[in-house]
Amino acid sequence: MKTYDIVVIGGGPGGYVAAIRASKEGKKVALIEQGHLGGTCLNRGCIPSKALLKHAEMIHAIRDASKYGIEVGDMRLSLPKMMQRKNQVINQLRGGIAHLLRTGNIDFYHGKAEIQPDQIVEITGDKPERIKAGSIIIATGSSPAVPPIEGLEQVAYHTSDTIFDIEKIPASLAIIGGGVIGVEFASIFESLGTKVTIIEMADRILATEDEMASQVLTKHVGKRGITILTKAKVAAVKALGSQKQLMIYNEAGAKQDVVAEEILVAIGRRPNLSASANLSLDMDGPFIKVNVRMETSVPNLYAIGDVVGNWQLAHVASAEGIVAALNATGHATDMEYHIVPRCIYTYPEIASVGLSEREAKEKGFQIKTSMYQLAVNGKALASGQAEGFVKLIADETYGEIVGAVMVGPHVTEMISQISAYMQLEGTVEEMANLIFPHPTVSEGLLEAASDWLGKGIHS
């Protein structure tokens, strides 16, 4: 039986990062993955969706070309070619991870892992094997959650795991869930010419995000023909010829039917726990309970990523993976969650970090906010993408930035600048004293900071 210092179960953005970091600390490491390297993010999530969102961006640019004095003829879409490009991106990144594992001298096992007593890991698959670990890191991720809707299992429906495998563009699509996954797919399919309906139980889409950001996106997607039903619950689904009929009730009990060719269920995700089924772990609801060092209730057993809840984000899983690897290799390190950037790749983009206004007030902060509208930003106007804003949330006494929300072009790239400021306990005054390049959307940060101080030039 082979023995390793550390065995990582799961090859997603948390698992493979943990394995590589542990290897760089001089440990003998094994990584087990039952699917493809890269996990959900690379194969069925972050990366393929961004590849298709790029297609959506290009489609809209072509459709809007006449606004810029460019006349084009009829546009033809090839879904097979789009999927081919998406798969090329995935395969290239998969190969990159495999190369990193090889150069890091990490043993890779393809199969399903189950943790047995005494740090034994049993691997089933093409080549069954048992290995022993000094420490184990569980990074098995999550799967799409499917609600118990009457009739849903009797019709064909999609989740984020299967929607990337469609073979033709649907004429209509009903999306159950108006969170991040739902609105991103709505943007993709609307660009392809699909009639999209979003059905959301809350009173707005992106209910956990900034309310004004949600309002801006709601207004924009409405202009593009996407129908949004809020305070709505799908009670039943049934086949209607080649289509599906969704029976929906609003909070007042009024019934409304939506007919669509395809259904996408996007209500959230549930943790994959089969690897630890033989263990008596302390749980936090459906998730594995861990401390700030990513340690579970079982000695020498760590858990990271979607199985522990917290933030179900790839970059958080990677950060947790590094923390777990460091602790497993004898370097005491705590995980920090107060500066987690969050990005939504819709049109316009949404990005945020730190505390919202509500959260800051609940934590007892005396805060002051400022906002700069991109409608007066030169670069945004020149680019034809002037819908959006930059909002800064800062401590009223010292001006320390505790949170930010941005809506507009390139904000998913800009948010890291705010994260860096917060990490260094930066203030709005320090930001207002920076020289920003002109013309850029990032000048919105300067304007918002200056406005917070009551010294804004363009606000």
Give the ranges of each region predicted by the language model:
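N-terminal Rossmann-fold NAD(P) dinucleotide-binding loop
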Residues: 15, 182-183
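FAD-site-proximal beta/loop scaffold in flavoenzymes
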Residues: 153-170, 257-328
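Glycine-rich flavin
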Residues: 2-4, 20-27, 32-169, 197, ...
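Beta1/beta-strand and adjacent pyrophosphate-binding region of the FAD-binding site
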Residues: 1-12, 169-179
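Gly/Ala-rich phosphate-binding loop of Rossmann-like dinucleotide-binding domains
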Residues: 19, 23, 186, 190-191
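Short hydrophobic core segments
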Residues: 7-9, 113, 131-141, 176, ...
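FAD-binding beta-loop-beta segment adjacent to the flavin cofactor pocket
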Residues: 144, 286-300, 379-391, 395
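Flexible, glycine-rich terminal cap/loop adjacent to redox cofactors
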Residues: 9-14, 23-35, 40, 47, ...
